[in-house]
Structure formats: structure tokens, C-alpha cells
Amino acid sequence: MAKKQDRKRKVKDEATNDGASGSDQSDNAEEEEDLLQTVKEPGEDSTDDEGIDQEYQSDSSEDLEFESDEEGNYVGRKGGQQESSDEEEVDEEEEDDDDDDDEEEGGKVEDKPTTSSKAETNNEVAPLPALPARDPSKQEYEDSDTSDEEDIRNTVGNIPMHWYDEYKHIGYDWDGNKIIKPIKGDQIDDFLRKIEDPDFWRTVKDPQTGQEVVLSDADIALIKRINSARIPNAEHEEYEPWIEWFTSEVEKMPIKNVPDHKRSFLPSVSEKKRVSRMVHALKMGWMKTTEEVEREKQQKRGPKFYMLWETDTGREQMRRIHDPVSAPKRDLPGHAESYNPPPEYLFDEKETKQWLKLKDEPHKRKLHFMPQKFKSLREVPAYSRYLRERFLRCLDLYLCPRAKRVKLNIDAEYLIPKLPSPRDLQPFPTVESLVYRGHTDLVRSVSVEPKGEYMVSGSDDKTVKIWEIATGRCIRTIETEDVVRCVAWCPNAKLSIIAVATGSRLLLVNPKVGDKLLIKKTDDLLAEEPSNQDIIDNERIKTAVQWSTAEAAEQEKGVRVIINHFKPIRQVTWHGRGDYLATVMPEGANRSALIHQLSKRRSQIPFSKSKGLIQCVLFHPVKPCFFVATQHNIRIYDLVKQELIKKLLTNSKWISGMSIHPKGDNLLVSTYDKKMLWFDLDLSTKPYQTMRLHRNAVRSVAFHLRYPLFASGSDDQAVIVSHGMVYNDLLQNPLIVPLKKLQTHEKRDDFGVLDVCWHPVQPWVFSTGADCTIRLYT
């Protein structure tokens, strides 16, 4: 084998050096052959003093090296597989010299001993199979699975193509132009193509471009191989010859062969000194054995106690040691567990079926057993659950944690907030003083003159009555064409005007009571019609409201101005200055709320969109703000900036009414779900306090203008007077104390108190009810 390798080297040198002679080559070959001969005599030992075999005859190191091209691709083994051009030349030379090699080797074998020839025969290694040379110019990913080099016409990416079903195009090309879908044929076209086109069976549709593609023979072959569960590439060889990259022969050689140092053979001087010191310590009694040392440490530590499951260094663990908690005692047996229980403890058929029905859910049973009755104690059988109950008891004793809980004996009065006594909060109404009778149907609304001398009421009997508060005498009755829903006296003391909402008309009435000069001034103001030539009204306003002067017949009743609306009016409210008033029409959609100006006889629609079914509106007493209450929420608008300021969340089903504190920082809301809500406008958009003082729907609430009082009326025929103090200190919360429950109205058709109103000067409250009366509480 070595000689054959030398031949190959010689042939390669001949290819590189053309001027070398044939005789020199043979001499060089003989010299190289002599260099590889063994140098020992037969039977001579080749091991050295350390027992290492110095005889080492190795194959050429070039057989274990490999060649690669510039790109790092495998080309072949050095001395084994060369470039294609070199291989042809070497093969030709080897064919010519095969005979000479055989003769020379035969002579050599005859001269050498038999053992050496066998060794050479065994050491010969079969040549490794040649690998195909790789072309460096070939692209790295030419035959791989990468899709980077694919020619993709449609650049939409990996998306579902059915997204383009609604469009005429199916994607975009590299230039950004749309790829138009091809024309689709019908079933007849498909049938003709199936008959006439010989390539119809190998035609498929490209989902990316929508074009029809004819499969080539290579594609058909690839599909067939995949369908038959074979490797797609036909050129791929599954069973390639194994290349032994690493030799299987283990070579044992020493890493280093350094002789031992002299001190390794001599005793250690330091150990000698240490032993002498230890001997001296033993003689003097200074040194002790390990057992003696451990015994002394144990005596110092003393006996050691520890918990079975965990350490006892924690506070709870120390408490368990020093202050153990005894196990709770089992409950004593009851009458149901007796062998002869009373008949009422035995199950009937219904209870027995229910007990057996809960077999899969035994924890839902009231008793874990079924009571039985025996004539005598000796007839009682063994208890089947005895072992299980003992086992569960043991589990509870050592697995369940124990703790002492101090029972808090809290007095109920301690939980009630400390409120001042009602006697300290006087004055407030306590008794019924007057009953105003005269209406024949429900009295829905009541309002008091700013000076507190007269009162006006509206009823379902289509009348408006003006009363003298002190005497209870009805001074005047004004008949209307429809049910009176709401009445409101102008808060401006310089005017004597009553706004009456009856049906879809709003009547401005001069009651003709009180100061005659004031009555004449009011008539002059209402009789004067301002010139609105420069003002162009919107069509929405014209169709929603119309101003007109009352006719002679109504003038005699005191009606001066009539404002006709397009829907029935439910509520009317005045601004604090008495020049503006607002009306509510729940059926008016986005025109439900209207604001009227008395001096200019103009109307405005503040909202263009409906935010809900409007129930009532209110003017702020100090700021230019407008409160709008829908069924569930309350919105506060700025009339100057014309924007929403705040939205109050009531968390109620239906709002019935609202009233604002004279200072303007607190709002009281009544709801049909038996609640009263107190809102602190500076604090939050949610109720500061929710009061459930009534048993039925709360229909009306009202603040007093001077005293810290508010009242509420409900369908339970009760008027509840409460104390509501608002402090100037913003850090102090309002004080709310219920004071008195006044219940004198009669209930009719499930209706009770419909409206409440405070006297502007005195701590008196008026209430109207379904019993056709108006009652004064003082």
C-alpha cells in the first residue's frame, strides 16, 4: 500500500516536472521504499525503558487529509481522489506500471519474513469512494428548497386569494400594476376544451395570477412520485456509500513522558514535623479525638427539641408550643340520631326521595344519615359510618390549623352614624295646618308667589286656582281647555306672572292679586310686542312653537300670552331672573326641550340631537348652566359655551324630578324606584348619598330657599322632611338628617303625593295629592 502511494506521488511529480528522467524516478522510488522499511531485526524488542513501543509505521498522513475548493466545498481526499484531469494521467501511468509493481513486490516479499508480509496485507485499507466535484460557479441555493429565487408575478404575499373575489383584479405585479383576472368561460367552453384540447388533463389554474398553466412532463413525473410516496427528486440516491470520515482504530500514545522527580521517592519533611507536633500534643493531653470533641459540643448545647414537620422559629409556631389550642369538641348527638326518635324527626316519602336523589352530592344533604326507629336498643345494628367518621376526625385533628378568634361584641348603635337630635335642628314642619279643598280631580302641581302671600295650583279637572295662603280661600279659578300638567309662578318679585302648561299650550297669566301697580306693570309688559324684524326664525323653531296674544275671552280670565307647542307639555320652569322659561315635551324627540325669552318673545331649541327621553329640565341659580334629566342620566350644559360640562350617573331606572340647592353646588334627584339621590357637583359624577326613605315611587323633591331643609313626596302618601346642611368649608361633607314623616294624604288609584313646594320665607311645605287636596305643613 505504501509503495502504491509512492507511485502516485511519483506520477504526480512527473506531471509537474516534465524534464525528469525515468531512471531517476526508479531510484527515488527505491530510496523511498527503503525509508519505509522496518529497521529492527527479526525477534528484536522495540520497546524503550518506559515500556512504550518505539516502532511506528504509519500510513501517509495525506490519506487522512481532505481537499476543498475556495468556497469550502468538499472535493476529495489528498492522495486518493484528485481533480478529473490529474486522475486520468495517474490512471494511465498506473496501468503501465502495474506489472513492474507486481514483480518488485514479489521479490520483496520473498526476501522479507513471512510475518511482515502478513502485516502489510492486513494494514492495507480499501480506497474510499470518490465524491463528485462541486462546481464553484454553481449557485449555492440552485437546487435547494428556498423560495427566494422564485419568479413571483403577484406580489400580494401569502394571503387568502378569496379576498379579491369582489374585485376585477387579483393582485399587483412588480411594477405596481393591477393583474386583471382572466375571462372565465362557462360550462360549454369547459366541455369543448375537454374534447378538443389534448393538454386539458394537465392544465391547472394558478391561484396567484388566475392564469391556466400546462404542467410539463417533469411536473407530471414529480406528482406521480409524490403520489406513490417516493422521494420527489429522481436523481437523489437513498443508499449512498458510507464515507468513513474518522478512522475506527484507536491509537494509544502517552501525552507526556516526563520522569518522576526525586522528591517523590523521599519522605516529606513537613509531614515529619507535623507528625512530631501531633505526637507531642497527644503526650501532653492537648489533642482529643473526634468523638471527645463531639461529646463536649453536645454537652454545651444540651438536649434539642424540634417540630416534626417544620421549624419552630416563627411566631405562630412558638405560640403553638407555649399556648396550644385544644381541639374543638364534636357536636353532641341530637334527637334525630336516637334509636327511638320522635315521629316528627322521621322522614316521610317526599323527604326520603329527596335524600336519595342527592346520592351524587351528599354534601347538600341536611343529615348524612336517614333517621330510623327501633323498638329496643338491642335491635340497633352496627354503625356503618363509624370507621369513616373516626378517620375524618383524625384528619381534622392533625391536618387542620387551629387559631383563636376573638369575638367582637359590637353594639348596633355603634354602627349608626352619630347625628344631631331633630330638636336641635328646628324649625321644620311637624304638623298639618291647612287643607285647601276645591279641586275635583288630581292636583298635579303647586307654586307659591315670591313674597309668600298667594299660591297657585293646577289639576286634572282643567282648572287653575289661586289661593290665599293664610286663610285658605280660593281667590280665583281659571278654566282651561285641557288638563293642567304644571304651574310655575315667576320668581321675579317685580312681575306677577304665572306660567300654566295645559295640553300643548303654555299660558302666561296675570293673576291680578297683590299690588295693583305691579299688576298694571305686568299687563304693560305682556301687551307690548317687540319688533323681531331683524331676527329670522329657523324653520325648526316655527314648526315647533308659535307665540300669540290671547283673545278677548281669555283676556278676561287673565291670560295674556299663549305659546303654542307641537306636542303636549309636561313641565315648565323659570330662570331666576324671570325673563327665561323652559318647557319639556317628552314626545318631541330632538325638540323636547325649548327655552323661551319673555322680553323678546323668542324661542330657542338648544339641542339638535336627542340624547334620550327628557323628563325634566332646570336652570342653575347662579351660573349659566342648564340641567337636563333623561330617564337614566343627568347632563349639565354650559349655555354660553354651548358645550357639555358634566354627566351625572344616577344608576336608577327612571328619574321623576330634581331640585337644586340655592348655592348651586348640590343637586337632589327623585326616582320612580323609591330612591332619592344627593349629588355633590364638586365631588363626583356619582351620588354622594342614596336615601331609601319611601316605600313607593318618589315623585317630587324640593329644596328650601332659605333654610337647610328639603322635602320629598311619594306614592306612599308620605311627605318626608329632612335636614340638609351645606357648609362653606369645602372639606366638610354635607349633613343629611331625616327629620319628620308627614302622612295625611289619602291614596287613590295607587297615587299618593304628586308634588311638594316650600314657602319662600317660612319653613312651611305644601303638598298636592291624588285626593284632590292641597295640604300645608307648618
Swiss-Prot record:
<dbReference type="GO" id="GO:0030687">
    <property type="term" value="C:preribosome, large subunit precursor"/>
</dbReference>
<keyword id="KW-0677">Repeat</keyword>
<keyword id="KW-0690">Ribosome biogenesis</keyword>
<dbReference type="GO" id="GO:0070545">
    <property type="term" value="C:PeBoW complex"/>
</dbReference>
<feature type="region of interest" description="Disordered">
    <location>
        <begin position="1"/>
        <end position="152"/>
    </location>
</feature>
<feature type="compositionally biased region" description="Basic residues">
    <location>
        <begin position="1"/>
        <end position="10"/>
    </location>
</feature>
<keyword id="KW-0539">Nucleus</keyword>
<feature type="repeat" description="WD 7">
    <location>
        <begin position="748"/>
        <end position="778"/>
    </location>
</feature>
<dbReference type="InterPro" id="IPR015943">
    <property type="entry name" value="WD40/YVTN_repeat-like_dom_sf"/>
</dbReference>
<feature type="compositionally biased region" description="Acidic residues">
    <location>
        <begin position="142"/>
        <end position="151"/>
    </location>
</feature>
<dbReference type="InterPro" id="IPR001680">
    <property type="entry name" value="WD40_rpt"/>
</dbReference>
<dbReference type="GO" id="GO:0005654">
    <property type="term" value="C:nucleoplasm"/>
</dbReference>
<dbReference type="InterPro" id="IPR012953">
    <property type="entry name" value="BOP1_N_dom"/>
</dbReference>
<dbReference type="InterPro" id="IPR019775">
    <property type="entry name" value="WD40_repeat_CS"/>
</dbReference>
<dbReference type="InterPro" id="IPR028598">
    <property type="entry name" value="BOP1/Erb1"/>
</dbReference>
<feature type="compositionally biased region" description="Acidic residues">
    <location>
        <begin position="60"/>
        <end position="72"/>
    </location>
</feature>
<dbReference type="Pfam" id="PF00400">
    <property type="entry name" value="WD40"/>
</dbReference>
<comment type="similarity">
    <text>Belongs to the WD repeat BOP1/ERB1 family.</text>
</comment>
<feature type="compositionally biased region" description="Polar residues">
    <location>
        <begin position="114"/>
        <end position="124"/>
    </location>
</feature>
<dbReference type="GO" id="GO:0000466">
    <property type="term" value="P:maturation of 5.8S rRNA from tricistronic rRNA transcript (SSU-rRNA, 5.8S rRNA, LSU-rRNA)"/>
</dbReference>
<feature type="repeat" description="WD 4">
    <location>
        <begin position="609"/>
        <end position="647"/>
    </location>
</feature>
<protein>
    <recommendedName>
        <fullName>Ribosome biogenesis protein BOP1 homolog</fullName>
    </recommendedName>
</protein>
<dbReference type="GO" id="GO:0000463">
    <property type="term" value="P:maturation of LSU-rRNA from tricistronic rRNA transcript (SSU-rRNA, 5.8S rRNA, LSU-rRNA)"/>
</dbReference>
<keyword id="KW-0853">WD repeat</keyword>
<dbReference type="GO" id="GO:0035206">
    <property type="term" value="P:regulation of hemocyte proliferation"/>
</dbReference>
<feature type="repeat" description="WD 6">
    <location>
        <begin position="693"/>
        <end position="732"/>
    </location>
</feature>
<comment type="function">
    <text>Required for maturation of ribosomal RNAs and formation of the large ribosomal subunit.</text>
</comment>
<dbReference type="InterPro" id="IPR036322">
    <property type="entry name" value="WD40_repeat_dom_sf"/>
</dbReference>
<feature type="repeat" description="WD 3">
    <location>
        <begin position="564"/>
        <end position="606"/>
    </location>
</feature>
<feature type="repeat" description="WD 2">
    <location>
        <begin position="481"/>
        <end position="519"/>
    </location>
</feature>
<feature type="compositionally biased region" description="Acidic residues">
    <location>
        <begin position="44"/>
        <end position="53"/>
    </location>
</feature>
<keyword id="KW-0698">rRNA processing</keyword>
<feature type="repeat" description="WD 5">
    <location>
        <begin position="650"/>
        <end position="689"/>
    </location>
</feature>
<feature type="compositionally biased region" description="Acidic residues">
    <location>
        <begin position="84"/>
        <end position="105"/>
    </location>
</feature>
<dbReference type="Pfam" id="PF08145">
    <property type="entry name" value="BOP1NT"/>
</dbReference>
<dbReference type="GO" id="GO:0043021">
    <property type="term" value="F:ribonucleoprotein complex binding"/>
</dbReference>
<feature type="repeat" description="WD 1">
    <location>
        <begin position="438"/>
        <end position="479"/>
    </location>
</feature>
